[in-house]
Amino acid sequence: TVITKNGDATQVVDADFFAEYPSAATTKDIGSAELLEGEPQYFTISSGTFEKRETDYIKITISTTGMSAITKKGDNKGDINETSVYFTIDFNWVDNSGVHHNREMFDTGFQGKVSGKYAHTFGFNIEQIKADHTINDWSIKVTKLTASPQSSDSVELQNAIYVDSIEAAIADKLEYPYTAYVGGVIDAEAFS
């Protein structure tokens, strides 16, 4: 398939044409300590490796090493049931005037039963925040909520959560006046 377009002085790259191409992104492996109820942890990417104010999209991966509710007493002793854990993900930023802002992006959690690791990546776009405010610096706050079930005399819970990584991406905002552009995709299997 060949797609052509005549160049002009104000052209920008057709977003649909390059939709399958990744943006510029950097990922930081976190490997956080266990998130404790009501004790937020803050995460960011070093500004030395990435121009943070240019960030358009952020992903954060949260995991659990297992989720279960084990009955310790009674006729059902030893039964393994599902449990849950709840947490919030907030986007915090400082504007050019030094004013701190906070916006809750997710109020969510995990529910179920799993004996091994389970991870989920949450992503959110901050381009509208950038359009409404200036962003000089930012961080992500994750808080395990006190509404999460806790172990008791009759039930032993496993519902610890951790932050595995964060990723910041810059969407391509390309301008090439009077220029033709070509994109290609090569299947990785061709390089076996």
Question: Where do the model's predicted regions map?
Answer:
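Polar, S/T/G-rich
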Residues: 1-192
